[in-house]
Amino acid sequence: MPKLRSATTTHGRNMAGARALWRATGMTDQDFGKPIIAVVNSFTQFVPGHVHLKDLGQLVAREIEAAGGVAKEFNTIAVDDGIAMGHGGMLYSLPSRELIADSVEYMVNAHCADAMVCISNCDKITPGMLMAALRINIPVIFVSGGPMEAGKTKLSDQIIKLDLVDAMIQGADPKVSDAQSEQVERSACPTCGSCSGMFTANSMNCLTEALGLSQPGNGSLLATHSDREQLFKLAGQRIVTLAKRWYEQDDASALPRNIATKAAFENAMALDIAMGGSTNTVLHLLAAAQEAGVDFTMADIDRMSRKVPQLCKVAPSTQKYHMEDVHRAGGVVAILGQLEKAGLVHGDTRNVLGTSLVELLAEYDVSRQPSQEVVDFYRAGPAGIRTTKAFSQDCRWPELDLDRAEGCIRSLDNAYSLEGGLAVLAGNLALNGAIVKTAGVDEENLTFRGPARVFESQDTAVAGILDGTVKAGEVVVIRYEGPKGGPGMQEMLYPTTYLKSMGLGKACALITDGRFSGGTSGLSIGHVSPEAASGGTIGLVEDGDIINIDIPARSMVLEVADSVLAARRVAVEARGWKPLDRQRQVSFALRAYAMFATSADKGAVRDRSMLGE
């Protein structure tokens, strides 16, 4: 029978000093021997997805203590990718994932906590906490802050839904008036919560459901809705149950590595492909799998992308549907339900509720005669009131969206495509692969061939797009922006946004060893591996080289003779794999990150082989 980890600090005369300190935090004799559960919060006033989390840690803590545990809360950092976008701040976004994972490990292991509730929400916070949870392998439940309500405004006598990306596009489009740009800006982000489309934050929070580490509705129920309070309360209650299953009953199925198995990672990837999730999720799933000791690679993603259909199109791929609409259609469970009917997910995976996926679908899938309580839960909708407060409204849709032909979530018979919303491309330009969000690519752009226009940084690419250097028909190549070369693998949302604002959104392709925001759409291919700084072929491309992209064939080829590439490689190796004439201040912290960073095909995690592992 495993003993409580916290017993190391609470039992024995030699731990008198530790107990004295625990007493100073409010613990009593009756608490020594109870599981100490870390409430890992991520409240910050910098990020709308986290601004409402301040009191939610204590909400969870009260439930933990009522259920027989001892709750101890601490906070992690949280970077807002939207605010950090387009300047040097974006260099810090992806590295913050590793810092979050390490800080959770440091706190939990230093104080010998027995279990965790992870209160996450935005882009790098959920994956950072997920990496830590699988690394430490003690009972855990994830509960996110929830998505933002979609913005709404009236343009051309029509009410349209908005999000952050709309504000960026309008602001960059010289044809849009100042008044209209400001109107969209003021309407795009109306409430607290993670940005309202199927961007990285919401994609990851949905994937925690498929991994079995969060409760139904975690990824889709609005931050503002009163029903979300119950998710937090239940998380506090259920984590105590999980802790007791492990420490009192020796039930190893309560541990995250026995929940997030290879089959669960395949379920999560199937969900991601079906719902057209952010390409960043590929990075984060690969990284999390390594922490879990699961053999899950780009080859698995490529295999699955060829057989899992795309069942959803959500913003930024369309303005029609946002996360509030996904929830109305039954949320993650409804998508998994469609995949389960086709045999595309593993029904025997387990979850933090203690059930199998098949059992969870029987109770929560809105297409399988659920209880009225479940129906009402998925009817939770937006109020349209600007607020930064959680649980501040209780509006409900008049009815669910059960239209599986043309609704938000489609059946396999009505899928947008039989091959899903993400694809892995390979070829001499990306020997270890690259990722494209096919859900955001128009059919006419699934194949593209054109001359390269090469930039050594995101900054010069933006300037080249806005000053007219980039022409229709070209393939924009942005390199030395990978995990090592950036460093930090910046998101390229501004280049893709400005291509659209300049009328080039469908006339150009973009290839990079950097990554893309979940808000990106169009023919945008990222995660090119190996990256330029690691000797990848993308570092050998020159202006005018012809690049041939064929998404249906999963190929991306640089049409340059091998002998020419070999000669270029000799020249680049002589000067070093680094950008020419790029002026960028890189801090010591970022240089340290770059030293250990691997390319995107490995999840951009640190290279353990450098430590002799």
UniProtKB/Swiss-Prot annotation:
Active site: 517
Keyword Amino-acid biosynthesis appears in the UniProt entry: yes
Any Gene Ontology CC annotation: cytosol
N6-carboxylysine sites (modified residues): 124
GO MF terms, alphabetically ordered: 2 iron, 2 sulfur cluster binding; dihydroxy-acid dehydratase activity; magnesium ion binding
GO biological process, alphabetically ordered: isoleucine biosynthetic process; L-valine biosynthetic process
EC class of the enzyme, as a word: lyase
Cofactor: [2Fe-2S] cluster; Mg(2+)
Cofactor: how bound: Binds 1 [2Fe-2S] cluster per subunit. This cluster acts as a Lewis acid cofactor.
Reactions catalysed according to its record: (2R)-2,3-dihydroxy-3-methylbutanoate = 3-methyl-2-oxobutanoate + H2O; (2R,3R)-2,3-dihydroxy-3-methylpentanoate = (S)-3-methyl-2-oxopentanoate + H2O
EC number(s) from the headed UniProt entry: 4.2.1.9
Pathway in which this enzyme or protein is active: Amino-acid biosynthesis; L-isoleucine biosynthesis; L-isoleucine from 2-oxobutanoate: step 3/4; Amino-acid biosynthesis; L-valine biosynthesis; L-valine from pyruvate: step 3/4
Binding site for [2Fe-2S] cluster: 122, 195
Keyword Membrane: no
InterPro entries named in the record: Dihydro-acid_dehy_C, DihydroxyA_deHydtase, DiOHA_6PGluconate_deHydtase_CS, ILV_EDD_C, ILV_EDD_N, IlvD/EDD_N
Gene3D superfamilies per the UniProt record, alphabetical: IlvD/EDD C-terminal domain-like
Residues involved in Mg(2+) binding: 81, 123-124, 491
Key words of the record: 2Fe-2S, Amino-acid biosynthesis, Branched-chain amino acid biosynthesis, Iron, Iron-sulfur, Lyase, Magnesium, Metal-binding
Protein task: Functions in the biosynthesis of branched-chain amino acids. Catalyzes the dehydration of (2R,3R)-2,3-dihydroxy-3-methylpentanoate (2,3-dihydroxy-3-methylvalerate) into 2-oxo-3-methylpentanoate (2-oxo-3-methylvalerate) and of (2R)-2,3-dihydroxy-3-methylbutanoate (2,3-dihydroxyisovalerate) into 2-oxo-3-methylbutanoate (2-oxoisovalerate), the penultimate precursor to L-isoleucine and L-valine, respectively.
Family the entry assigns: Belongs to the IlvD/Edd family.
Subunit structure and binding partners: Homodimer.
Name of the protein in its database record: Dihydroxy-acid dehydratase
